[in-house]
Structure formats: structure tokens, C-alpha cells
């Protein structure tokens, strides 16, 4: 699939411009979402039932549950979702292994992303909790990660759900190499603009990065031929953004056919 980055010409050629452009557009999701207006906090049977599930899954008791209840009500008053839906979101987070403090600090980013993107809370919770784990981030980073996803999806031909599917396959490898969530989102956005999306993008990106990180045979020869390296002369890892810029510089001047050949040699085929 990464062979399709014979579109590599257009994709990598414009990577530099788009990288800086997306970077400047990481505007807080929360601004627009809070403006949706205050919706009455729905309590009662649904809310109590949902909070009971949270208690059962998370093991939270006493003052912890009081804090979670209060937070759920707060989310019900400041987002388009009800307090009961906020409680359901907490249940998804608890199932992902988040503890009370994680849920208290992370729920706002998840709910704001769900509201801004139109995705349901279950999908959004899965995307955020899984990706934060892969990139070694904490629950308190959920708001920042939500902003990254919202900005990248609005500036590329993709959406939060498809980006989440890509992250599912690629994030563990990207995170293990120390690549940032920001740079990863930009790479995924660029691939989406080249017509490579969702799980296809995830498996392609995972394969490409794995090939470059542990090159053998054809890949090692191609990296030497085109002067591609994941590390600088001192052995320090380049960031993913620097790697993309390196690919743009080394391959951007090739003909379309040569770029397709380079892509096949460097990234392999899924």
C-alpha cells in the first residue's frame, strides 16, 4: 500500500508546508464546544445506573465516587452531552484501566473531541485511551491529544474515526520509537490526502516505519542508495517530522516512476 506513495511525489513534496501549517492550527477544541450552550444536567435512574457501572469497573468508592459524580454532572452542564452520557464515558475509561484521577483529568478532552467530531463517546474513548498509552502519554494529556486529532482531521481528507483506526495499527510502533503524537497525526493526514486512510494507512505506516527501523536486504540497500537514515551522525533518532522532511528532500526531485520505485524499495508492500 505504501507503494501508493508514488503519490509520494505530491505528498512528500508538500510535506514541509503542510507540517508547519497544521502545527499552527492546533487550536483548542474546547473553545467551540463550550459555546454549544449549557444543557440541563440529567440525573435520576440513568445517571445512577451509569455511575454504578463506573464504581463496579473502576473499583472507586466513597470520596472518589463523589468526585466522579460531581465531574459527570459538570460535564453534563458544559458539553452537549448529559451527565448520564458523561458517566457512560467514564465507564469506557474505566474499562481501559483508567483510575479515578485519570478519569477526572481526562474526561473533558474526550467529551469535547466527541462533540466536535460527531463521533460517539465509546469510539472516541477507545481512540484516545489507546493512543495515549501507545505514545506514553497520561490521561491529563487527553485534551491536548484531542486538539491534535481535531486539527489534523479538519486540515486533511479524513476524520477522527478513520484517524483512530490508523492509530490503532501504527501508534504502538510510532510510540515505541519515540515519535510524537503531533508528528504522527501530520503523517496520517498527509497519507489521507494521498488516498491512504483508516486501517490501510495504519498497516502501511506500521510496515514502512518497521522496515526503516530494522532494515534488511532490499530496504537497507535502498536506504543507503537514497541516503535515508533514522538517526543523525551521533546516533540520535530523528523526529518523525525530520524523517518526513528528509524523505521529501531525498526523493522529491525524482521522477514519478523513480519515486514509485523508491517507495516500493524503502517501504515494501503490504
Annotate each PLM feature.
Residues 5-30:
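Membrane-penetrating hydrophobic segments
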Residues 24, 261-270:
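Glycine-centered helix-coil hinge/cap
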Residues 25-77, 88-96, 103-117, 123-156, ...:
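Small-residue helix-packing and pore-constriction motifs in hydrophobic alpha-helices
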Residues 86, 259-260:
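Short amphipathic alpha-helical segments that mediate assembly, nucleic-acid/protein binding
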Residues 245, 250, 255-258:
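Alpha-helical protein-protein interaction modules
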